[in-house]
């Protein structure tokens, strides 16, 4: 699997360097995100979705809406600013865990997900309590998925009034 524009900075950089005399076509492919929706069986339109690269989330104080689906890619590489390595940066991972536990309860269920690499193989889907994030078996392919908190989903009273006026 793989999409040429998803976690593919070198390819996008190469495309940006081409001049207009070279015609290029970027064909879509199936990404981890597509596999995630199918394997975990959820619709991102239900509650919305937020997705972040783990290191981007760590560095730039991204705001998470707990009422939406949250996907944090490359959680096993968080804090790695160099070449991919199988060594986990537990200090960075624990920092993310702390940020997430401030938003969710410690026992909030989350999933470590890895899409199947080849046809006929199975994805890795491991459910756990968020407070156990630093105890999960992670690789460079690991994605963290946190389902939405239904309790926090409250429709806007102004929008409801508007819709009642329109209908």
Residue ranges and their predicted role:
Residues 1-3, 28:
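Glycine-rich beta-strand-to-loop/alpha-helix junction loops that act as flexible
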Residues 8-18, 22-167:
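Beta-strand/loop-alpha-helix module characteristic of Rossmann-like adenine-cofactor folds
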């Amino acid at each position: 699997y793989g999409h040429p524009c998803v976690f593919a900075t070198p390819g996008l950089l190469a495309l940006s360097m081409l001049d207009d005399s070279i015609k290029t076509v970027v064909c879509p492919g199936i990404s981890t995100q597509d596999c995630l929706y199918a394997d975990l069986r959820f619709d991102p339109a239900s509650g919305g979705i937020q997705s972040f690269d783990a290191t981007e989330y760590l560095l730039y104080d991204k705001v998470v809406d707990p009422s939406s689906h949250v996907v944090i890619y490359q959680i096993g590489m968080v804090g790695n600013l160099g070449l991919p390595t199988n060594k986990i940066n537990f200090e960075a991972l624990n920092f993310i865990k702390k940020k997430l536990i401030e938003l969710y309860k410690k026992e909030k269920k989350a999933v470590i997900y890895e899409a199947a690499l080849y046809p006929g193989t199975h994805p890795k889907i491991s459910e756990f309590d968020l407070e156990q994030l630093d105890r999960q078996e992670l690789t460079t392919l690991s994605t963290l998925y946190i389902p939405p908190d239904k309790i926090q989903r409250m429709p806007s009273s102004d929008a409801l009034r508007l819709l009642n006026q329109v209908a």
